[in-house]
C-alpha cells in the first residue's frame, strides 16, 4: 500500500481543499450563449425562453 513520505502541512492540505470549494461555484453557474434570433443571453442547447426559437426555428409560440 502507498504510504506518504512526509507529513502534509496544513497549508498544502488547505490549498487542496480550497479547489473543491471553488469548483462547487463554478459548476453551479451555467455558461451562457446568445440567442441567434433575439440576442438574449440563454443557456446553450435549450429553447430560448424569450422568443421560443431553437437553432433558427420557432419551437414554441410566445407572446
From Swiss-Prot:
Q: Name one GO biological process term.
A: translation
Name one cellular component (GO) term: large ribosomal subunit
Which controlled-vocabulary keywords does the entry list?
Ribonucleoprotein, Ribosomal protein
Q: From the Swiss-Prot or TrEMBL record, what is one GO molecular function term?
A: structural constituent of ribosome
The UniProt entry, under SUPFAM superfamilies, shows: Zn-binding ribosomal proteins
Query: One Pfam family of this protein, by short name?
Result: Ribosomal_L32p
InterPro entries per the UniProt record, alphabetical: Ribosomal_bL32, Ribosomal_bL32_bact, Ribosomal_zn-bd
- HAMAP family tied to this protein: Ribosomal_bL32
NCBIfam families this protein is in? rpmF_bact
Q: Which family does it belong to?
A: Belongs to the bacterial ribosomal protein bL32 family.
Q: What is this protein called?
A: Large ribosomal subunit protein bL32
Q: Which organism is it from?
A: Aquifex aeolicus (strain VF5)
**Taxonomic lineage:** Bacteria, Pseudomonadati, Aquificota, Aquificia, Aquificales
Amino acid at each position: 500500500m502507498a504510504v506518504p513520505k512526509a507529513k502534509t502541512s496544513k497549508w498544502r492540505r488547505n490549498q487542496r481543499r480550497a479547489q473543491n470549494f471553488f469548483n462547487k461555484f463554478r459548476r453551479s453557474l451555467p455558461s451562457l450563449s446568445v440567442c441567434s434570433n433575439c440576442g438574449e443571453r440563454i443557456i446553450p442547447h435549450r429553447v430560448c425562453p424569450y422568443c421560443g426559437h431553437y437553432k433558427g426555428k420557432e419551437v414554441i409560440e410566445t407572446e
